[in-house]
Amino acid sequence: MNLNPINPKPKPALWLWWLAAIFFVGASVCLGWYLYIQANRPGHDTPLDALAAPVFNPLPLGSVMPKGWLLEQLKLQSSGLTGHLDEFWPDVKDSGWIGGKAEGWERAPYWLDGMVPMAYLTDDAKLKAKAKHWVDYILKHQTADGWLGPERGNPAYGLIGKAPPNAVRDPWPQFIILKVLSQYEEATGDPRIIPAMEKSMRSIDLQLDQRPLFNWNFFRWGDLVVSVYWLYDRTHEPWLLELAAKAANQGYNWTSHFWDLPLKHKSERWNWVGHGVNNAMGLKVPALLYRLTGDARYKKLAWRAIEQLDRYHGEPNGLMSADECLAGLNPSQGTELCVIVEMMFSLENSLAVTGDVRFADRLEKVAYNALPAACTPDYWRHQYVEQSNQVASAYVEQPIYATVSGIANIFGLEPQYGCCTANMHQGWPKLTSHLWMESPEGGLAAVVYAPCVVDTQVQGDAVHIEEVTNYPFSESLTFNVTTARPATFPLYFRVPEWTQGATLKLPDGTIESLKPGEFHEVSRQWNGTETLLLQLPMPFKLRKGYQDSVSVERGPLVFSLGLKPKWFDFMPFKFQPAGPRKFDWAAMPQTPWNYALALNTNDPNQSLTVTQRPLKGNPFDPGNEPIQVTVEGRRLDSWQSSEGAAAPPPQSPVESMETLEKLELSPYGSTRLRITAFPVLK
């Protein structure tokens, strides 16, 4: 008898039973997970008979007007490139859209998409005259079949790649100009606009039957659908829903894209799917598809899209890295300025449709940090790409970017490409017009906070609201609500996820505690002028990032170590404009940047101290910050530059024997050279 058989007969059966059991359980789990995913993943885009209602509706352009520091930003921008680009930059001054010989594709529509709302939000007579001149010309030259603008744009821009051989008309610029016209109609009530938009969409509808979407318009179809919905909400023409569904079914499948992001690492070459602006524009698509189909799973997908980009390409400033294509988690990778403004517009759309506070929180983070940091304080120069860890703004022969050149982060008129020169203008104006929205049951919602005034009709009654605040540089907001006669309606106040202990003092003196991550409703009768006081405490939070580095957040603001720059003129290689500012600026740091922070990561409020000053002038002008944060840190000599940028932060925690120093952190938006993602000391 073999007491120690090598292959005893009873045991294989036992192991096989165990193996079968494991396989069965595993298969059941996998099948269950697959069925769960399929049940929660949005399906085909079958349109409803009418659009599903959004949670909020944006107010018409001009209903919300900027005040305080926000008005200062719009005035600075209108005195800068926004108000003058058409006077000297050939691609707008001599645009094919007004009969010129220059580019007749996306650049003039991009500029108008920001200039038109800027004109009416600043009540600038000169800009309003420019807006009218452009709109008059475009409408006068609409073709008999409805096409707006040049029928053949610039083939070097519009028809690259595998365009159909008969692709004479590129609908992508049409998508932009339709957004321009809808804003113009809201501001002026011009009766020509709605018929012109309807004719344009009929023309696009016919073209999509003959030439399906391709290239840029294949990825950016969501911007057409935004205008289709705008028109449908006013005309209720059923064919518009069919056009929206046609675009969704012909265009890129953003549903699958954002369900499981196909590009999880830095792009090593340019590609359509990873293009940052395409992704920023695509973020609005899930919300748009919810309205088209009524499928609530699209609402969930809208935030999942943000989570996917955060997971693989998220940056401390609230953006995705994209220079030009998705570039991973390294905070020295850049993000294109077009991504900033287009992501803001997508967040505004997703916020309106879903009513999800998180979209507003992210919108403020991008707007109050990344947007102002990408431009000089006078808005005459901008960067093509911006870095969270930006230790230089100068030409680099072999840059860290994979898909743009070594001049991409200088501050100039047209660094790298001119698309951002044309498209940067929409950020502040569209944010302003989306600060307040109306609720379907006849109320008003404060969805994003900034100093402003609101004048609108609520259930037939004129309502005036004055929002007095220095937010995001202050925790206090005062709302003076005025009605001409007694009127009963609800107001909704957003309570950000990041706040703790928020309160709202009502006109009768009652103080209500607020729950983070929700809209707080105050439904009552309003009479005369009544005041509410909102307090949003801003505790410090640490965002963990690449290599366990951290960035410091307080409310919507991100704080950076601002580096003292040495500026010098930098003439572009090929383009030397003859406009008011004919040179670009480059900068090198004059102060050390390679610090690791001494932080209590369990309670950062123990390690960080706030200093506040009166807000005067431009809060995003370096040296004029109304708030700073003090923290201690040590130099980290092993952390040096690489490829013209800060090397990736060393894996935290780190050790340093250098002297412990006090460091002053400034709001990200007031810095032009900076470190934002820091290693943490042991």
What residues fall within each predicted segment?
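C-terminal beta-rich recognition modules with glycine/proline-rich loops and embedded aromatic residues
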Residues: 302, 361-369, 374-477, 515, ...
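Extended ligand-binding groove/face enriched in aromatic
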Residues: 97-101, 119-258
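Active-site neighborhood of glycoside hydrolase catalytic domains
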Residues: 221, 225-260, 270-327, 339-356
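Carbohydrate-binding/catalytic loop surfaces
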Residues: 86-102, 149-169, 218-231, 260-281, ...
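Solvent-exposed beta-strand/loop surfaces of large extracellular or lumenal domains
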Residues: 499-525, 542-547
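Well-ordered alpha-helical segments within folded domains of soluble proteins
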Residues: 104-120, 169-185, 217-233, 274-291, ...
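Low-complexity, Ser/Thr/Pro/Gly-enriched N-terminal "stalk/linker" regions
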Residues: 35-107, 125-154, 191
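N-terminal Sec-pathway targeting helices
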Residues: 9-24
